[in-house]
Amino acid sequence: MDIQLYMLAPVRPLSDGEANALLARLPDALRERLAGQKGGKRDASLCAYEMLRRAMQDHFGWEALPEVAFGAHGKPYFPSCSDACFSLSHSRGAVLLAVHDHSIGVDIERLRPMSERMRTRFHASDEAAFWQDWVQRESCCKRRGISAVALRGGEVPAVPDERIFAFSPLHNYVAGVCTASDEKTGKLVRLTVEELI
């Protein structure tokens, strides 16, 4: 199976009715976890999991998401289906999802100013270089299910056969993907909130 990437942008505020409709489509434990969130973070999370539900329906024929569990550092996964792997990320108005049959990690960041101190710490020549490096590191942490605290030390230890790349899915955004698979990446599927609701 090729690596499938989905993106939602912009994430607009959801009405209470829209949020409740998306919450109702989630497995019980995930619904409870997200019900306590408010505002933009809640809206991005609800859209991300609805995008995941649609992707799983497209690729595996699932009508509903199975229970979602979370690793020690927050990596979501399906405990009942190890061959359906995914990674979610959201940043300031955009959501990115990767679906694959092997472990995968994604990260998306909106380009924004970064202090000279941080750029120096990570040996980045400018903000764009900093964020490109950041999303690649973060996607590795997400694939491996380790804490992003590993990023503070600079280098993320290399893993044999791991493939990492960055791309710009949207103006002023950069995304990173990390996988140990040799499969190619399919075309980025762009969605809107209206298409999800």
PLM region spans:
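Core catalytic alpha/beta fold that binds nucleotide/phospho-ligands
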Residues: 1-197
